[in-house]
Amino acid sequence: MDAKTDDKDAGKCPFSSGSHAHRNRDWWPDQLDIQVLHHNSKKSDPLGEAFNYAEEFKKLDLAALKQDLTALMTDSQDWWPADFGHYGGLFIRLAWHSAGTYRISDGRGGAGAGQQRFAPLNSWPDNANLDKARRLLWPIKQKYGNKISWADLFVLSGNVALESMGFKTFGFAGGRADTWEPEELYWGPEGTWLGDSRYSGERELSDPLGAVQMGLIYVNPEGPNGNPDPVGSAKDIRETFYRMAMNDEETVALIAGGHTFGKTHGAGDPSLLGPDPEAGALEDQGLGWKSGYGTGFGADAITGGPEVIWSQEPTKWSNHFFENLFNFDYELTKSPAGAQQWVAKNAEPSIPDPFDPSKKRLPTMLTSDLALRFDPIYEKISRRFFENPDQFADAFARAWYKLTHRDMGPVPRYLGPEVPKEVLLWQDPVPAVDHELVSEQDIAALKAKILASGLSVAQLVSAAWASASTFRGSDKRGGANGGRIRLSPQKDWEVNHPAELAQVLSKLEAIQSEFNAQGGGKKVSIADLIVLGGAAAIEKAAQEAGTAVTVPFTPGRTDASQEQTDVESFKPLEPRADGFRNYVSSIRHQFMKPEEALVDKAQLLKLTGPELTVLVGGLRVLGANYGHTTHGVLTDRPERLSNDFFVNLLDMKYAWAPSPTTTGIYEARDRKSGELKWTGTRVDLIFGSHSQLRAFAEVYAQADAKEKFVHDFVAAWTKVMNADRFDIVR
């Protein structure tokens, strides 16, 4: 029997999840949101905290799985028939669009977590009908269970699609563990699909975005804002592909390689498409874009607007894309859906129909395809690929591998028998350990030498933080391993105090040289010494504040060379702001408030709210501020690891007010005398203003929290220092 729903109070959800319920964000939209720090916790993982995907993947029979995927490619289903009898084009698009959300600015997006299963990605206009691809994969995912994640399966399906059509891929690595809830990412300011208010000035795309319109992966295939201008399209392509770490050659290879296969779908009026998966009815069971045009699928399929087939053999690897690009001139036309596209002039029908073998079509191209011919830089590369198919095949194989693996981090995270032996520069390689590591006795001796070197607690802590805090949990780049703080571009970043950093490194290098010259095969890297110096300084600072503590240290980091470091690709890791050091760049554009940038940085470091809180409080009293400013250094005993920051911030003896002379600075004055006692920034004051952060701060300001504060700080510090240590068990 159905539940009664017509009573006055019946059917009302007691939680704030109803469509008309007011959430805190509705009442206070400007409130700092720190919930992003607690998303995708193990508590939301149905596989449990003990589940280890890397270990489970090792049990996978990859060859059998690939055999099943190969069979799927030609197993056309009546409910969503395969174009040309082969699903290859569909699964290439699935893998591409899973990986293609990656952006180099903050490392977010990409294929690494299977996020295409969730909103908003599962309902983006550019991902229309990829829900069908995911449903086609379900029987295979069901069969192999936890041995293969959705994230890995999406990418592998694209590889198998290519291989099943005669292309030799560069390789495949597993290791992408699924997440179980949508990531809260900033995809743009627009409130409507395909909106483009992300631009300013002369079509300047705002940071950190990578696509030209809301709901697109890269560019509008019809041209900028639907304007069929190939040269203008090339500008959009260059910008968006650069923002996902692709150069011009990789860009050409990816577009041409992907468009060697399959087709676009614009058989009829797009207004006949039903709602996307997230907006669909219960009975639609997560499938969206139900079409009212004809049968709604097969020859009547509508995904977007254009109806384009690029190749005479759309289920085989070939050079037909470039042959058609250069051998014909094109004139503007419209698809059956009314979209702008191009058709070959003076050509004979040579393109197969996807469902009727008796029919042939004229060669067609997208505006974004013609960009590869009419942009002078792209044209030169395209013509070389046209004349040298082997170079094209190699470039596409490498670019596809980079596209689908860019957010996986260092090679030690790569799993499976198809991982290439060749190490690539974009993987940020570090040398293998080829020597005996330091012992506990050595560590103690090295700490003593570091503390006797004349370097201060603040200098050592600052150097260690600068080295390790470059880590991004999004694409697993950065971190202390490799010691790249010694190299360009990091050694010259404003936030790292280049002159002072050079002094610190010089003294640590002298200690390293002396130790490594002892012989016996035992060595220590600068990367390890930087982290060890921070540990030694924290132990000293804690001891002087009255708490004895040992900061955990695991040796094994190695020193990368400048040749192993792609300077251009490391530039986006330079912080615009780092609230942990009270730093805001004076020359780079800020698109977040300082406190928002702090939370953003904490999320990239995979920190929780309490960890963020204790680290800021500790780093302030240790003197790790940029420029050695005293803003937020709320203590009369700096370089001692005390909870003074929290005690004094929350002390009602002082009243805070904006500085009358300096924007962004606040002054704390004695309520009775008016005497100036402290200064702070927005990042400092947020721990007294924001109710949840204040709750954390109150814990550390309590009289019984002195030891807890030190131990919690050390735990959070160690987490950051080891964030990129995928070689150790944690």
Swiss-Prot record:
Residue ranges of coiled coil: none
E.C. no: 1.11.1.21
Entry cofactors: heme b
Keyword check for Iron: yes
Cofactor binding annotation: Binds 1 heme b (iron(II)-protoporphyrin IX) group per dimer.
GO cellular component, one term: cytosol
Highest taxon listed in the record's lineage: Bacteria
Catalysed reactions, as listed in the record: H2O2 + AH2 = A + 2 H2O; 2 H2O2 = O2 + 2 H2O
Modifications made to the protein after synthesis: Formation of the three residue Trp-Tyr-Met cross-link is important for the catalase, but not the peroxidase activity of the enzyme.
Entries under Gene3D superfamilies matching the protein: 1.10.520.10, Peroxidase, domain 2
Site (Transition state stabilizer): 93
Numbered residues of crosslink Tryptophyl-tyrosyl-methioninium (Tyr-Met) (with W-96): 218-244
Position of the Tryptophyl-tyrosyl-methioninium (Trp-Tyr) (with M-244) cross-link: 96-218
Signal peptide residues on this chain, from the entry's feature table: 1-21
Catalytic residues identified in the record: 97 (proton acceptor)
Protein's GO biological process: cellular response to hydrogen peroxide; hydrogen peroxide catabolic process
UniProt cross-references to Pfam families, sorted A to Z: peroxidase
Subunit structure: Homodimer or homotetramer.
HAMAP family the record matches: Catal_peroxid (MF_01961)
Official protein name in the record: Catalase-peroxidase
Organism whose genome encodes this protein: Rhodopseudomonas palustris (strain BisA53)
